[in-house]
Structure formats: structure tokens, C-alpha cells
Amino acid sequence: MLCLPVFIILLLLASPAAPNPLQTRIQSNLIRAGPEDANIKTDKRIFAGLLASILKPIIDAAKG
């Protein structure tokens, strides 16, 4: 009869300590993933627009 409460207490203590397999798999995938895997690709139009907005005033000032 004493075994049942001891078993329940051990079960309650052990269950929060067990890692969530889905969470650990996602974390390991994110650690190994590169920018290409995470769809973090640079958009050439953004860089072209930024460079144009930065360089155009410099070129215009140099010309005139």
C-alpha cells in the first residue's frame, strides 16, 4: 500500500524533468540551420534602393 504514493510522487517528480522531444528537436534544428534554411535571403532590390539613396546625393554633390 505504501508503494502507490511513492510511485505517484516519483512520477510527479520525473515528468517535469523529462525534456520535451519536439522542443529539443526544434532547438537543435534552429541551431544547425543557416540563413538559407530559415528563408533569410537578402533582397537585391532593397540593397539597390539603399545604395541609390545613399550614393545619389554624393554623386550629385560631386558633379555640381
Swiss-Prot record:
Family, per entry: Belongs to the conotoxin T superfamily.
Protein name, entry field: Conotoxin VnMLCL-05
Prodomain positions: 20-43
Spans traversing the lipid bilayer: none
Reported tissue expression: Expressed by the venom duct.
Organism this protein belongs to: Conus ventricosus (Mediterranean cone)
Upper taxonomic lineage: Eukaryota, Metazoa, Spiralia, Lophotrochozoa, Mollusca
Claim: Secreted is one of the keywords in the record: yes
A GO term, aspect molecular function: toxin activity
Modification Lysine amide occurs at: K63
Keywords noted in UniProt: Amidation, Cleavage on pair of basic residues, Neurotoxin, Secreted, Signal, Toxin
Note from the entry: The mature peptide does not contain cysteine residue.
